[in-house]
């Protein structure tokens, strides 16, 4: 019997999730204990439909090296959620397919829902006496997985966000003879890690973004307007960063308040997301120049701002996952253990995936100012090491040269 390795990607992509794939695949191909490395096309959902590929040719033709610096999910993704009931027929169907393909090692690269899949598969394996070793490799730009210092994908997304906010601030400062407000809406529905990283854009104390709002603290539109008025007495060009999920603390997202704002000359509601709502609110209450910007998916797919630290850790976590499985670990997620901020020292370990899935890690309240409008120095010490170093992405005809499935 062969001892084959099966790997897949799931959930939203990141700029370095393929770095983790590179780590798993390269380590698997190099290890004599593993006979074949098989990729699942579109995760567990694709595997159920028998969509797989042999990963060995990618090393032979040089594609594997390009995969390392390609954003998105090379193998494709899915949002397939396995049933809670472990007696559901999908489980024996999956394990029958594992047997047919002689799978001894299963790796799933993803976030919270992916770790839920790892948990269910490993628990089912235990009930039927399967010796398949099942390991989760973390990824998420949201940085909200528990029991790990941070997650691959966050450092590059944070670097992109902070870089873009710094560029927006430079653009806004051009017309410094009239008051203006620029509102930057950043991903993060329940956790504000990405928005908090915008604080890294500041060149000095008091620099833009002057105001930063996270979903961890209840948001008051009235207090926001007063804070904007106060800050405009000190700077004419105000940049404000908000998480898309800012809310009133009682379950109502700010974007849901849009019906309270007026309509345009055609009777259309002036709304989309939280940023647009606040843009209209500032326009209505203060009557000054204001615009809102959504960073949106660029935060997770930009190769131009890859953090070398992030990419290196993504690949290393993939390699460590293979080693952990070969050492007999199963039902675990690779976690990141920080030993020091300065110098930055990181170690890898494993944590019980059942203690991770379906939980969220918020930005600590003590890292946010009491009025909820700024970020403290503790966060800066935490985040700054994660954005260090640049990555030279292969270029062709003046544009990034990415890998893609043929």
Region roles according to the model:
Residues 255-406:
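C-terminal non-catalytic interaction/assembly regions of soluble proteins
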Residues 1-52:
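N-terminal phosphate-binding or glycine-rich loops at protein starts, especially the Walker A/P-loop
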Residues 14-24, 47-48, 91-92, 112-120, ...:
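Short glycine/serine/threonine-rich phosphate/pyrophosphate-binding segments
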Residues 50-104, 113, 141, 163-166:
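Glycine-rich oxoanion-binding loops at beta->alpha junctions
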């Amino acid at each position: 019997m062969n001892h084959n390795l099966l790997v897949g990607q799931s959930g939203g992509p990141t700029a370095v999730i393929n770095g983790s794939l590179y780590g798993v695949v390269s380590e698997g191909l190099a290890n004599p204990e593993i006979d074949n490395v098989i990729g699942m096309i579109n995760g567990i959902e694709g595997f159920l439909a028998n969509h797989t590929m042999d990963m060995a040719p990618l090393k032979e033709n040089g594609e594997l090296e390009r995969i390392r610096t390609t954003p998105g999910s090379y193998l494709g993704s899915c949002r397939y959620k396995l049933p809670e009931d472990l007696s559901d027929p999908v489980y024996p169907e999956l394990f029958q397919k594992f047997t047919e393909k002689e799978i001894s090692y299963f790796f799933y690269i993803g976030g919270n829902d992916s770790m839920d899949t790892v948990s269910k598969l490993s628990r089912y394996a235990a009930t039927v006496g399967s010796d398949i070793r099942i390991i989760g490799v973390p990824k998420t730009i949201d940085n909200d997985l528990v029991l790990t210092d941070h997650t691959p994908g966050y450092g590059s997304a944070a670097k992109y966000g902070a870089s873009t906010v710094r560029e927006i601030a430079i653009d806004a400062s051009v017309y410094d003879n009239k008051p203006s407000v620029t509102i930057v809406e950043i991903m993060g529905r329940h956790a504000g890690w990405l928005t908090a990283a915008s604080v890294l854009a500041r060149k000095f104390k008091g620099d833009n973004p002057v105001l930063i709002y996270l979903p961890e603290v209840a948001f008051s539109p009235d207090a926001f307007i007063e804070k904007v008025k106060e800050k405009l007495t000190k700077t004419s060009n105000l940049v404000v960063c908000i998480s898309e999920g800012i809310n009133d603390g009682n379950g109502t997202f700010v974007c849901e308040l849009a019906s309270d704002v007026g309509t345009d000359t055609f009777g259309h509601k002036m709304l989309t997301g939280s940023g647009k709502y606040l843009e209209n609110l500032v326009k209505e209450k203060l009557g000054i120049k204001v615009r809102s910007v959504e960073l949106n998916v660029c935060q997770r797919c930009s190769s131009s701002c890859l953090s070398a630290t992030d990419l290196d850790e993504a690949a290393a976590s993939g390699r460590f996952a293979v080693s952990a499985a070969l050492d007999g670990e199963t039902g675990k997620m690779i976690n990141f253990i920080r030993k020091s901020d300065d110098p930055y020292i990181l170690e890898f370990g494993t944590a019980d995936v059942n203690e991770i899935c379906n939980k969220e890690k918020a930005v600590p309240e003590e890292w946010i100012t009491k009025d909820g409008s700024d970020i403290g120095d503790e966060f800066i010490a935490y985040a700054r090491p994660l954005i260090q170093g640049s990555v030279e992405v292969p270029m062709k005809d003046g544009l990034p040269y990415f890998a893609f499935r043929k």
